[in-house]
Swiss-Prot record:
This is Uncharacterized protein AF_2201. Binds 1 [4Fe-4S] cluster. It comes from the Archaea. It holds the Pfam family DUF2148. The keyword Cell membrane does not apply. GO terms for molecular function: 4 iron, 4 sulfur cluster binding; metal ion binding; oxidoreductase activity. It comes from Archaeoglobus fulgidus (strain ATCC 49558 / DSM 4304 / JCM 9628 / NBRC 100126 / VC-16). InterPro entries: 4Fe-4S_dom, DUF2148, Nitroreductase-like. Its cofactor is [4Fe-4S] cluster. [4Fe-4S] cluster binds at C92, C95, C100, C118. Keywords: 4Fe-4S, Iron, Iron-sulfur, Metal-binding. The lineage of its organism: Archaea, Methanobacteriati, Methanobacteriota, Archaeoglobi, Archaeoglobales. The keyword Iron applies.
Amino acid sequence: MLLNEKDFKNEGVKIAALIMAESARTAPKSKGEDTIEIVYVDGEEMEKIAAKMEEMAEGGDKDFIRDAESVRKSQAILLIGAKGDRTVGVNCQACGFESCSEFKKADRKGENFVGPNCAFRMIDLGIALGSAVKVSAMLGIDTRIMYRIGIAAKKLGMIDADVVMGVPLSALGKSPYFDRAPKK
């Protein structure tokens, strides 16, 4: 059998994304409580994200257009988010409230992300993201963590989380996620 890499590139990227998802899932979490949400996206659903990002650029942030172009050059996206409403219960005050009890009474709102959020849950999100992209680097798959992708996917209802980051994946001759000029 002969297989040209171009014929199985998308399958390879999907396998990498699935392994990345499991690395994010098994990453250490505060008190061992898992509030991480992970969704794999490819094909037509990616185009919906890119279109939503272009729509959001009309609000003034033209870098949504640049990042939408990156989405279109990708073979898949991994959405990784966290629910920040569950506290760890240590009253650390990093959220800006005197106690976890006060935090729980706060109105949770936000146009792009929902907050306030427990700082430990956001740390957990960062660790999960780091674990995922570590795997992509080990596997030779290009990625970049992008919050604009997360916002668009959240607005489209693709993931149930308060804060979401998008991790596009690509296996091209050159990474499409660097040397990107800001849009004007």
